[in-house]
């Protein structure tokens, strides 16, 4: 008699805990290293309260078993089992399966095996389901349920005898509130943070809304750091703020910063079970609340029991990747020296993100914390100018490169170098330096936009930063021109809302064609053509198509190009043996190397300099991984 996992669709809340438990169980109980490695054998179809988990039915006389030409699939122990060593990737089983639950992964069939190799003997998905919507069933049990339902229906008791739904009892009735926000009329007059931190009552309210889907929940998985989100939210419920801060710092080096600048709507909050029900739990605000509150109470990371090691590591770059790497190494007892060409730590966090999103005193406080942990910072120190790369590789046991991507993408339009046309990063950096009391630099000259018509080309978060900075600098008008529709904008939804509230005008579905200048060569307008959304490209995003005859000019005194970032030149790497790809990014993790190890084995790299411009949290995760790889290298040498 066959056994299989049966789902009670009415009780499924769409939390995806079953998928995560399955993927983790088949990865030695560890998080998969990447989303491409996330391969659950059970799948939730639909979403919210219309969701339903689907897995292999382990059929008697299974069509997949009959179809397999090499006997890789056999019926044993009341279930259909797969011998991956025999599988030849012919796909006959996937075609034969009437339920579509046999997949091909890297040319090998994959299906539910009822966790037959799991030491506990239990099925991971059943074990973790918060509403008990999954159960191990056989044909006899299924028939009994069917007969019982038929009898109730015949007796007219199907509805009157219905039990209260477990899923309905679990889901909260309170809707999301989030953090208070300063009014647009007030906040656009200054550069202070616009979001107020949660107070204890607000934090309790939000934490009480969490349904604690599972210890390893969907929000954990969609956080690149795999923060223990349900667990630290539970600690907030219990009033254990110090313990929550300790837990946050186990997986994150900058939780108070991520709580402010992470695009939670695309990560943890976007994966929250309550997103389409009563609104996602305000995870980012809770993360900020935990760390801000704990630090205000005097909490600091305790490194008093750290045993010093003999190794020394040089970290190039004091951005999120470098700080993440230094944090892990310092906690392991390694002596760490961080080198950065800027006068303060943080990289883009300090000089690329405006103060109204991230107050710079937050970075100053974090620098004090890292210094107290034993990390030495060498600022205003540029590799190749103040110290050579070969000096670092000869003096240190390992080197980490986390320099980010500071190259700016161009549009290749006529007159792109005309007066009044500027790039986003120099614009943002110059004004941030001014607010910090730093002198104006030749690399980052100030741009006066007061009383001028400002147009920003782009649609990401950097675009929003330029727009909102221009508003605060008293521009006469500020307009965003983006070639796709609003739904296709790559930036955070809340940043678009904030910009619109503050007075930014949006021109969607317009593509730049040229830059118009007067007889003196100064900018007067940007030539645009309207677009219509076409079919999706290889990346899944719909492509804009120019609409013939729709050309027009948008007057502008200042035009800011915000098309994103790419690798910048690193001449100090020449002759080192470290390989770059065709985009100028550092190559790591080739066969025979650790994931973040370059072709020069004592040099590691991570963050945007390896993967291209991405998020603060992904850069930090890469830096922390590099530190773990270094420790693996050190321990291997020691043994």
Curated annotation (Swiss-Prot):
Organism whose genome encodes this protein: Escherichia coli (strain K12)
Chain residues that bind [4Fe-4S] cluster 5: 210, 213, 219, 223
Cofactor: [4Fe-4S] cluster
Keyword presence, Iron-sulfur: yes
Domain writeup: Contains an N-terminal 4Fe-4S dicluster domain and a C-terminal pyridine nucleotide-disulfide oxidoreductase domain.
The protein's name: Putative oxidoreductase UacF
Binding annotation for [4Fe-4S] cluster 1: 12, 15, 18, 129
CDD domains: HycB_like (cd10554)
Biological classification of the source: Bacteria, Pseudomonadati, Pseudomonadota, Gammaproteobacteria, Enterobacterales
Encoding gene per record: uacF
Alphabetized GO MF terms: 4 iron, 4 sulfur cluster binding; metal ion binding; oxidoreductase activity
The keyword Ribonucleoprotein is assigned to this record: no
Sites where the protein binds [4Fe-4S] cluster 2: 22, 112, 115, 125
InterPro entries linked: 4Fe4S_Fe-S-bd, 4Fe4S_Fe_S_CS, DPD_II, FAD/NAD-bd_sf, FAD/NAD-binding_dom, GltD-like, Helical_ferredxn
Source taxon at top rank: Bacteria
UniProt-listed Pfam families: Fer4_11 (PF13247), Fer4_20 (PF14691), Pyr_redox_2 (PF07992)
């Amino acid at each position: 008699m066959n056994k299989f996992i049966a789902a009670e669709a009415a009780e499924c809340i769409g939390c995806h805990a079953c998928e995560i438990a399955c993927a983790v169980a088949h990865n030695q109980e560890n998080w998969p290293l990447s989303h491409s490695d996330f391969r659950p054998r059970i799948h939730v179809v639909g979403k919210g309260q219309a969701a339903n988990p689907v897995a292999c039915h382990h059929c008697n006389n299974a069509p997949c078993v009959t179809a397999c030409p090499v006997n890789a699939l056999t019926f044993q122990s009341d279930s259909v089992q797969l011998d991956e060593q025999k599988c030849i990737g012919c796909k006959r089983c996937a075609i034969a399966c009437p339920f579509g639950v046999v997949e091909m992964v890297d040319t090998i069939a994959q299906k539910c095996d009822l966790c037959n190799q799991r030491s506990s003997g239990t099925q991971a998905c059943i074990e973790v389901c918060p509403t008990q919507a999954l159960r191990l069933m056989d044909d006899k049990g299924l028939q009994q349920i069917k007969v019982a339902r038929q009898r109730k229906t015949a007796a007219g008791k199907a509805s009157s005898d219905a039990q209260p739904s477990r899923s309905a009892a679990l889901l909260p009735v309170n809707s999301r509130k989030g953090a208070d926000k300063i009014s647009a009329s007030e906040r656009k007059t200054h550069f202070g943070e616009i979001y107020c931190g949660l107070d204890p009552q607000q934090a309790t309210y939000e934490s009480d809304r969490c349904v604690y889907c599972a210890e390893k929940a969907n929000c954990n998985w969609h956080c690149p750091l795999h923060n223990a989100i349900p667990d630290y939210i539970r600690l907030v419920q219990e009033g254990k703020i110090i313990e929550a801060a300790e837990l946050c710092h186990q997986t994150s080096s900058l939780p108070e910063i991520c709580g402010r600048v992470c695009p939670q709507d695309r990560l943890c909050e976007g994966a929250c079970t309550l997103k389409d029900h009563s609104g996602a739990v305000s995870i980012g605000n809770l993360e900020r609340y935990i760390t801000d509150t704990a630090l205000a109470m005097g909490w600091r990371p305790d490194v008093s029991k750290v045993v010093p090691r003999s190794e020394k590591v040089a970290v190039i770059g004091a951005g999120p990747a470098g700080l993440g790497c230094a944090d892990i190494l310092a906690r392991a007892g390694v002596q760490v020296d961080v080198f950065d060409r800027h006068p303060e730590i943080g990289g883009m966090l300090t000089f690329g993100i405006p103060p109204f999103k991230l107050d710079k005193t937050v970075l100053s406080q974090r620098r004090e914390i890292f210094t107290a942990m034993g990390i030495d910072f060498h600022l205003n120190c540029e590799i190749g100018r103040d110290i050579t790369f070969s000096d670092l590789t000869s003096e240190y046991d390992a080197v980490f490169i986390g320099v980010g991507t500071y190259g700016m993408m161009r549009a290749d339009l006529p007159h792109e170098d005309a007066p009044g046309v500027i790039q986003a990063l120099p614009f943002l950096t110059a004004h941030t330096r001014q607010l910090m009391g730093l002198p104006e630099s030749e690399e980052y000259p100030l741009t006066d936009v007061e009383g001028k018509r400002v147009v920003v080309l782009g649609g990401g978060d950097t675009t929003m930063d330029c727009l909102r900075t221009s508003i605060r600098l008293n521009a006469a008008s500020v307009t965003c021109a983006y070639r796709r529709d609003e739904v296709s904008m790559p930036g955070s939804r809340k940043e678009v809302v904030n910009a619109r509230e503050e007075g930014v005008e949006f021109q969607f579905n317009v593509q730049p064609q040229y830059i118009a200048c007067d007889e003196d060569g100064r900018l007067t307008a940007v030539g645009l053509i309207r677009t219509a959304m076409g079919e999706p490209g290889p990346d899944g995003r719909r492509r804009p198509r120019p609409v013939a005859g729709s050309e027009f000019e948008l007057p502008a005194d200042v035009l800011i190009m915000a098309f994103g970032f790419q690798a910048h030149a690193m001449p100090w790497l020449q002759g080192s043996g470290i390989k770059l790809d065709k985009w100028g990014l550092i190559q790591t993790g080739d066969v025979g190397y650790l994931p973040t190890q370059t072709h020069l084995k004592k040099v590691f790299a991570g963050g945007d300099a390896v993967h291209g411009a991405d998020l603060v949290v992904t850069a930090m995760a890469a830096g922390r991984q590099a530190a773990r790889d270094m420790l693996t290298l050190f321990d291997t040498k020691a043994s």
